[in-house]
Regions:
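Nucleotide-sugar donor-binding/catalytic module of glycosyltransferases
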Residues: 142-405, 415
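Short beta-strand-to-loop acidic/aromatic patch adjacent to the donor-nucleotide binding site
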Residues: 272-283, 531-544
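A short, conserved alpha-helix in the catalytic core of glycosyltransferases
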Residues: 348, 358-385, 413, 548-552, ...
Length: 738
């Protein structure tokens, strides 16, 4: 049997070869003969079966795999006749990897052969030629698009997550298949060079990589394999067999110099305008080059593009997805969330000197940090497409040599800040293998003065707790406290104020009888403050660790940061605030509410600092510059609810960065001081605030850069949302100096 892509065709049950193998002649010896056609996860999409019986009519059947083996309900009877052309579209990838053909239900002799084709057009040309030769009267049986994946019904949770990933990928690739191709503007014949360092790669890895490259449906690309002096006979034999293969360029280095050196050797041979780097066990996703080319054509200003990832096992079965946020320079200091598939401009790579030696295990991270320096964020694009498959196995480099890779990553991060003239140390994050940048402060007197603004009325237990926490459990050396009181009458509270005013310099209680309006309270506090920056603090908050305020203030060292939010927990140690997603529920909402306090979230992002569009006003630091630029809080439209979202979105649209940090962690006994918004006048007021938020910020259509468009927006714990359209490339958002 002739195959362009390797097929494992098993003659099972009641079948014997008849005559010479090249004749493809078989004899059925019973009433249930069948062939099982097995194809790989990555394959050519069109399978054509030629079936012919000269001496009598036969009654073939096709069995289509739907996830539970081949059963009678999967059978598709075909017409009765003597000659058949059976066509099946199995797609370019999938985890359903078999088709069964029963040639007849009785003893007979017949010819059976199978071909695969890269597309429908090539298949039709081959069918026409075959019909002209000897199958003019063949019955055409088109099985259509076969299921690529198993149905997601009644699966346990782990298998469901894997199946969701597969279905998500399938939907993206089907949408991309119908996409017309547009080549990006380029002065070079090759617009994209893919460079892969190789060392002792198994043959099947190289086969998968090459097949995934060949399956791309756009011209103008090259694949460069740079071998790091492999010793494996299997790898070397694979090279020898492809010595004359003009589809790939193989660079065979004579000495083993490591990944960085081998990659640089490959980069020196690249001729494309753009360059992508992959590992030898990676796979290029279906239609990836076409989707990327279209994006580059639409964004000629782009200087860097990165994509999402499909996580697969050793046999390429989908296990999960890595859906990334839009570019986040703060998150990047904690983890290389960008990784692959990333596109660099070749001329800039040449200018910075390619990869540096000495960063083994994190050489890509170091390259990324160096490459992105000085590039405006408006030229850094995130393409939400699963453009490559990361084969995650026990032998993955970053797992096998994790200590070396972690140390190299921290050295690269420290070096990145040093080049900008900022001294930092890099410590473990809440996940030990991830990273936390700590900015150096030479003297305690160098910390800027912070004006802490606390709205309050009565509530002795709450206000006494937070004031005690500030003065006794907070190690920040330079702050004042302004309690903005809208009419306390409790003698204990008034006495507490008087005591603090006598004993704590910088403490003031500004009392004015009026209806509670959070925005007005904040405006009063900021007007009367004397600090360099402003910290808004609810009265129902408790300090957990003493360094929380230093952490929040230190985040202002990140470029253009205007607002910083903290990690807040309910009293039962579950998450109350890990950042606000604009558009969640059509308005804005906290993501991952009620998760355990140590919950890491997607890509462990909740263990790291993140750029957000919004954070809660319960614990919110505002830089003086941002406060002056954005102006007053909106006392008319947002008296109690959503005022923090409105203020953050105004700052975000003005180009200020908003950071959420998990390293400042406090308890928040939410709304104990003002009650519920679910009934009476409070509900009427809250409904008006919702309408104001929609009207002023169009939150229903807001694309929050912190949330990948592959996640649903209907609930706090967002799951995968099967796409109906391909999401466009995304930017972080409005920019100041960025």
């Amino acid at each position: 049997m002739t195959n362009r892509v390797k097929l494992d065709i098993t003659a099972a049950n009641d079948l014997l070869p008849s005559g010479e193998p090249e004749t493809n002649t078989w004899q059925s010896t019973g009433n249930d003969p069948f062939f099982r056609i097995n194809y790989p996860v990555l394959r050519s999409p069109i399978i054509v079966v030629f079936l012919e019986c000269d001496h009598r009519d036969i009654d073939p059947q096709a069995y289509i795999q739907r996830g539970s083996g081949f059963t009678e309900k999967d059978a598709t009877p075909l017409p009765i006749g003597r000659r058949f052309v059976i066509i099946a579209d199995v797609g370019r990838f999938g985890i359903n990897c078999a088709l069964r053909i029963d040639p007849a239900t009785f003893p007979c002799t017949f010819e059976f052969s199978v071909e695969t084709y890269a597309n429908r057009q090539k298949a039709e040309r081959a069918i026409s030629l075959r019909k002209a030769e000897d199958m003019a009267e063949a019955i055409r049986c088109d099985l259509g698009r076969l299921p690529r994946f198993r149905p997601n019904i009644g699966l346990p949770s782990l298998r469901r997550s894997r199946n969701d990933a597969a279905a998500f990928a399938q939907a993206q690739y089907q949408l991309a298949e119908a996409l017309p191709a547009t080549l990006p503007a380029s002065d070079d014949t090759i617009w994209l060079s893919t460079v892969v360092p190789v060392y002792n790669a198994p043959k099947r890895y190289l086969d998968d990589l090459l097949r995934s490259f060949e399956n791309q449906d756009i011209p103008g690309t090259q694949l460069i394999l740079s071998d790091d002096a492999s010793t494996s006979e299997e790898t070397l034999r694979w090279y020898d067999e492809r010595a004359e293969d003009d589809r790939i360029q193989i660079v065979r280095n004579t000495t083993n110099g490591g990944i960085a050196k081998a990659t640089n050797a490959g980069l020196s041979k690249a001729t494309g305008t753009w360059v992508a780097l992959l590992d030898h066990d990676d796979v290029i996703a279906p239609h990836a080059f076409k989707v990327i080319a279209n994006t580059l054509a639409q964004h000629p200003e782009a200087r860097f593009v990165y994509t999402d990832e499909l996580v697969v096992d050793d046999k390429l079965a989908p296990q999960g997805v890595m859906l990334k946020p839009a570019y986040d320079a703060v998150l990047l200091t904690g983890v290389n969330y960008i990784n692959h598939f990333s596109l660099y401009r070749r001329e800039r790579l040449e200018r910075i000197g390619y990869l540096r030696l000495g960063f083994d295990g994190s050489q890509d991270y170091d390259l990324l940090l160096r490459y992105l320096e000085g590039i405006p964020e408006s030229q850094i694009l995130h393409l939400p497409y699963l453009a490559y498959w990361w084969r995650r196995t026990a032998a993955t480099y970053s797992q096998k040599f994790i200590e070396t890779a972690t140390a190299a990553a921290r050295a690269a991060i420290k070096d990145r800040f040093a080049r900008g003239g900022t001294a930092v140390t890099v410590e473990p994050a809440l996940t030990n293998t991830l990273h936390r940048v700590e900015f150096a402060v030479d003297n305690e007197t160098d910390w800027p003065k912070i004006s802490i603004i606390i709205p309050n009325r009565d509530k002795f237990d709450l206000i006494s707790t937070i004031l005690g926490n500030l003065y006794e459990r907070t190690d920040y050396p330079n702050f004042e406290v302004l309690v903005i009181d809208n009419g306390s009458t409790d003698p204990k509270v008034l006495e507490l104020y008087a005591d603090y005013e006598r004993t704590r310099p910088g403490f003031r209680a500004l009392i004015k009888e009026e209806k509670f309006n959070f925005s007005r309270s904040i405006n009063r506090g900021m007007f009367n403050a004397s600090g360099e920056h402003f910290l808004l603090l609810n009265n129902d908050v408790e300090v957990i660790e003493s360094n929380w305020l230093k952490e929040m203030v230190s985040c202002l060292n990140f470029d253009d940061t205007g607002i910083v939010g903290a990690k807040l927990l309910y009293g039962d140690d579950t998450l109350q605030h890990a950042g606000v997603i604009t558009g969640l529920g059509g308005l804005a909402g906290h993501w991952y509410l009620n998760k355990p306090s140590n919950f890491g979230g997607p890509m462990k992002r909740l263990h790291l600092r993140n750029s957000m569009t919004c954070v809660t006003g319960a614990v919110m630091l505002i830089s003086g510059e941002c406060a002056r630029a954005i102006g007053a809080w909106d006392e008319e439209n947002f008296t109690v609810g959503y005022n923090d979202v409105d203020y953050c979105l105004r700052a975000y649209k003005a180009g200020y960065r908003i950071i959420w940090t998990p390293y400042a962690c406090l308890y928040h006994h939410e709304s104990q001081s003002r009650g519920s918004d679910k009934s009476g006048e409070s509900k009427i007021r809250f409904d008006k605030e919702k309408e104001s938020l929609r009207r002023l910020h169009d939150t229903g259509a807001f694309d929050d850069p912190a949330l990948n468009p592959g996640y649903e927006k209907g609930k706090s714990n967002p799951g995968l949302q099967i796409p109906r359209t391909l999401a466009a490339a995304r930017l972080r958002g409005p920019s100041r100096s960025r």
